[in-house]
Amino acid sequence: MRLPAAIVALCCMVGVASGEDAMPDSLTGAKGDPVRGRAITVSRQVGLCLLCHSGPFPEERFQGNLAPDLAGAGKRWSEGQLRLRIVDPGRINPATIMPAYHRTEGLARVAATYRGKPVLSAEQIEDVVAFLMTLRD
């Protein structure tokens, strides 16, 4: 479990050090599944994205208004930009309130049972990225 976290941390540092705002390489080496990614995005138990974001999900009530609308996300950002924003949004905006969904180091106020564990697995991150890339309108 520590090796994937170290790889993610290294990828984030390399991207920021070189002035990039993206994490171009897949965390798993494979494309994600957009159907699973949509399920994670709208889930009130897993991704919790709709607590802050809204999007093209008419069947979902009580969508957030604190963060950017997810409609058109695949048009506004590249796959790598979306990946970094999910894995470690603090690399883009240190003042963000969005949690780091895959970074496990340097976090504040994490319950003991969750320390060292990412919110989403590498596969789940890739699934969400694949789904967000389908949102072109």
Q: Where is each model-derived feature located?
A:
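Electrostatic cytochrome c docking/interface patches
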Residues: 20-44
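Short pre-active-site segment immediately N-terminal to redox-active cysteine/selenocysteine motifs
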Residues: 44-48, 56, 124
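Solvent-exposed, polar/charged alpha-helical surfaces in well-ordered, non-transmembrane soluble domains
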Residues: 35-39, 80, 84, 126, ...
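Bacterial N-terminal signal peptides
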Residues: 5-15
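Gly/Gly-Pro-rich "capping" loops immediately C-terminal to redox-active cysteine motifs
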Residues: 27-31, 50, 54-91, 97-111
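Soluble non-cytosolic domains of exported or imported proteins
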Residues: 31, 35, 43, 76, ...
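C-terminal capping alpha-helices of c-type cytochrome domains
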Residues: 101-137
